Amino acid sequence: MSYNYFGKKILILGLGLTGISCINFFLKKGIQPRVIDESNKPIFLNKIPKNIEYKLGNLKENWILESDLIIISPGISSFKPILMKARSLGIDIISDIELFSRETKCPIISITGTNGKSTVATMVKKIAEKSGYKVLLGGNIGFPVLEMLNKKASLYVLELSSFQLETTFNLKSKIAVVLNITEDHLDRYPEGFEQYKKTKLSIYNKAKICLIKLKKGEKKPFNTKSKKYISFGTCNNNDYYINYEKEKAILFHKNKKIVDTSNILLNGHHNYENILTSLAISDQMKFDQKVSINVLKKFLGLPHRFQTVHINNNISWINDSKSTNVDSTKAALKNLKIKGTIWLLLGGDGKSSNFNILKKYFEKIKIKIYCFGKDGLNLSKLCKKKSIYTKTLKQAIILISKKIQPGDVVLLSPGCSSKDQFSNFEERGNLFIKLSKEIN
């Protein structure tokens, strides 16, 4: 289908990297959009061409309601009342991913999930490159997708958040996968978890091959002319699954052993699931499985994902700043099997999530919990006997440094967004790394 944007009133919401890429996209087509950013001082304001009309501060209602097409940045909720009103009037509200999907015919692998998206997307990119593809990685990681249209590629790998999928309707992926869905971003969705889940699952709508995760006893849908289903997961009712033999994880494909994880550099069940999914994707792309396995054996993981950043006096400092939801913190705690004390740094913006699931882990293990940030005080009430509240991450680390002993682990796995006190999770993780080395 061909889309004609000429003669339409086009409005771009948001002046981050996504918004700037949207401006450039339309300017190359000879179209001048309008732009609104809710901030009075957006960081990319100096990148707006002089002839572009823009407004800063609150969303300008008359600009929104007189538009024919609105492109919304992922940081702006599509459930704002003014945008819901615009939608009810028949105004199209779409993402940059939707614009991108209308323009390209190159094969796309799309990956979403609450946790593990970046890791799996990066694994698949590395495997595809070793298999001879010219690969571009974008979406929620790497390039803004519209910038990728200007570069040569034989395959796109997209990491997609629920925010991006909210307003994406025509993404025709060769392969689409939802890694997992657990509570996150509930402050964004008026109807709660089910709405968040539905948004994630929409990635399958126009995909050719759907990789789905089955729980015990579940069955995958029947293949149709337009869709093929491949399953993965922990249970052996999946096409790809994990089995433990003497506490060692073995990866299987249809009852055939394909990977012994004792030969893999990454540890932890969540990482074994990421590896399994990457193999399933690679097999569906018909990459040489030996090449895929060799890449995965050498993969060291991504920064800020359960990364040991400092060891001194037999005290380990683990940076898991990318842990921005409850489930990722739970996975980090399950990974740690030590005789010493775990000093957990937990806190930030909890995004209305339910943290009660962590209680049983706190009660079973030798742990001290230092809660900080916007929701730190409430988090400290989860397990009062083992918790201390501080305003900032730095204050918590200073207190911990006076008490840690050889054999202990200091774990930054906040389970929360960093936006209350930091620009992003990277800034939070980098502060942790800096302080771990200074204090020791």
Swiss-Prot record:
Main location: cytoplasm
Catalytic reactions on record: UDP-N-acetyl-alpha-D-muramoyl-L-alanine + D-glutamate + ATP = UDP-N-acetyl-alpha-D-muramoyl-L-alanyl-D-glutamate + ADP + phosphate + H(+)
Enzyme class (EC, first level): ligase
Pathway(s): Cell wall biogenesis; peptidoglycan biosynthesis
Keywords, in A-Z order: ATP-binding, Cell cycle, Cell division, Cell shape, Cell wall biogenesis/degradation, Cytoplasm, Ligase, Nucleotide-binding, Peptidoglycan synthesis
One annotated GO biological process: cell wall organization
A molecular function GO annotation: UDP-N-acetylmuramoylalanine-D-glutamate ligase activity
Pfam families cross-referenced by the UniProt entry: Mur_ligase_C (PF02875), Mur_ligase_M (PF08245), MurD-like_N (PF21799)
Subcellular location: Cytoplasm
Listed EC numbers: 6.3.2.9
InterPro entries reported for this sequence: Mur-like_cat_sf, Mur_ligase_C, Mur_ligase_C_dom_sf, Mur_ligase_cen, MurD
Entry GO CC: cytoplasm
Entry binding sites for ATP: 113-119
Family: Belongs to the MurCDEF family.
Function field: Cell wall formation. Catalyzes the addition of glutamate to the nucleotide precursor UDP-N-acetylmuramoyl-L-alanine (UMA).
Protein name from the UniProt record: UDP-N-acetylmuramoylalanine--D-glutamate ligase
Encoding gene per record: murD
